[in-house]
Amino acid sequence: MKEYDYMVVGQGLAGSSLALHLAWAGRSVVVVDQPARNQSSSVAAGLFNPVTGKLLSKTWRADELFPYTFEFYQRAERTVGGTFFHPKPIYRPFLSIEEQNQWMSAGPEWQPYLERVSPTSTFGGQVYDPYGGMILKSCGYVDVNRFVRGTREWFGARGSFVDDFVDDVQPMDQGVEWKNIRAKRVIFCTGCALPPVLSFLPVRPLKGETLTVKFAERPNLIYNRAVYAVPADPFYTIGATYQPTKWVPGITAEGRHELEEKLKSLIKIPFVVMNQKWGLRPSTPDRRPMLGTHPKYSNMLFFNGLGTKGVSLAPFFGRQMAFFLERMGQIEGSVNINRFKTLYSKFE
């Protein structure tokens, strides 16, 4: 029987972040995952962007999340080796004079994220921007596959990665057991693939489709408006569709058509579609992460619900989860599973 402080089940963005934070704290960690089952991180474009939505508002907790996003991935690169963190400006064309005026008079709270606001066409040779646009900073993309693979190999080189499927962890008074592994605590970071013991969690699968395209010329920046074009050398990832309900597994002609039309309305550069992918992102009813302890088994915990913003949410809340496990802090109310208190009624 091999003994560890922590067993992390699932190794997408959430599991990778948590496992690294615990390792940095000097704890023994074993990570268990079957990479072939990962349907979210494996197709993620990895974009992190402080400005979000049709109304171009600041993303939730941006002033806290984004500084730590930079700190975490740079440290992760030094730890596991390789390059997967790519800070890069994003250009968002304006859709109207009104939108242009709004951002020309943006207040000081936007200073950390606005590189430049232009009232005239800036990249008109590549995109449709008759009203100008804004160049955002403190943004970019993470090569998620490379990050996850590098983290997996780092733990594997230390004999702390197991390629297997887990759904039957046995809780005990002083920890948990699974096959030949005993750990003081287990944390499930399995996204939409919930084990039976956590089936009460309100994780909502959110389907997304992406395209892999080859452009006739290389875009100058990351372009983002209704659709994004993120480098995935030598190609680009275009995404993503957003289907919270009534979705079917697999890629669809409708998904491809939607992305192609949005891309054509944003970027003038001719392109060829090379591939199409789909995945399920774990969302929650209020679109906030979900951290906490099983109501019956105190040694069984979970870190889930990162949705469409996992690249920026995973580092910050992975650290918060690690602090909680190490008794160095609490899980804040906005992400604590206790906010869905009615889910616990059957355990009381």
Please give the residue ranges for each predicted region:
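Short hydrophobic core segments
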Residues: 7-9, 181-193, 318
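C-terminal catalytic lobe of FAD-dependent flavoproteins
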Residues: 275-348
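Active-site substrate-recognition segment that forms the wall
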Residues: 14-25, 34, 42, 47, ...
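Short beta-strand to alpha-helix junction loop
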Residues: 56-68, 134-150, 250-254, 312
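Helix-loop-beta segment of a Rossmann-like dinucleotide-binding subdomain
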Residues: 54, 82-92, 116-153, 163, ...
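Beta1/beta-strand and adjacent pyrophosphate-binding region of the FAD-binding site
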Residues: 2-14
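Helical element adjacent to the flavin cofactor pocket in flavoenzyme catalytic cores
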Residues: 134-185, 189
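Dinucleotide-binding Rossmann-like beta1-alpha1 core, especially the glycine-rich loop
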Residues: 47-125, 130
